[in-house]
Amino acid sequence: MTLHMPCKTVKALIKCSEHGPVFITIEVDEMIWTQKELKEALSDGIVKSHTNIYNCYLENIEIIYVKAYLS
């Protein structure tokens, strides 16, 4: 996990128990300053990436890798 706080871009490799790994990129308008805000951005990004179409609900998703940076 590589975190540069504050950040505006987050890349994550996630895995649902039923499917293989999915790579998502999240770009936010406002800076992410805390790990709590980072978790919220990841949750929103997972939902917006339509990963949940494949029955991957947040409680079933494993976050394998996260990279957060400013640009």
From Swiss-Prot:
It comes from the Viruses. GO terms for biological process: negative regulation of cytoplasmic pattern recognition receptor signaling pathway; negative regulation of type I interferon production; symbiont-mediated suppression of host cytoplasmic pattern recognition receptor signaling pathway via inhibition of MAVS activity. The keyword Repeat does not apply. The keyword Metal-binding does not apply. GO terms for molecular function: protein sequestering activity. GO terms for cellular component: cytoplasm; host cell cytoplasm. It is found in: Host cytoplasm. Keywords: Host cytoplasm, Host-virus interaction, Inhibition of host innate immune response by virus, Inhibition of host MAVS by virus, Inhibition of host RLR pathway by virus, Viral immunoevasion, Viral RNA replication. Interacts with host MAVS; this interaction inhibits signaling pathway leading to interferon production. Interacts with host MYD88; this interaction inhibits innate response in dendritic cells. Interacts with TRIM25. Interacts with IRF7. Mediates the regulatory switch from transcription to RNA replication. Acts late in infection by inhibiting viral transcription and up-regulating RNA replication. Plays a major role in antagonizing the type I IFN-mediated antiviral response. Interacts with host MAVS and prevents the interaction with its upstream partner RIGI in the signaling pathway leading to interferon production. Inhibits host RIGI signaling by preventing TRIM25-mediated RIGI ubiquitination. Belongs to the metapneumovirus M2-2 protein family. This is Protein M2-2. The gene is M2.
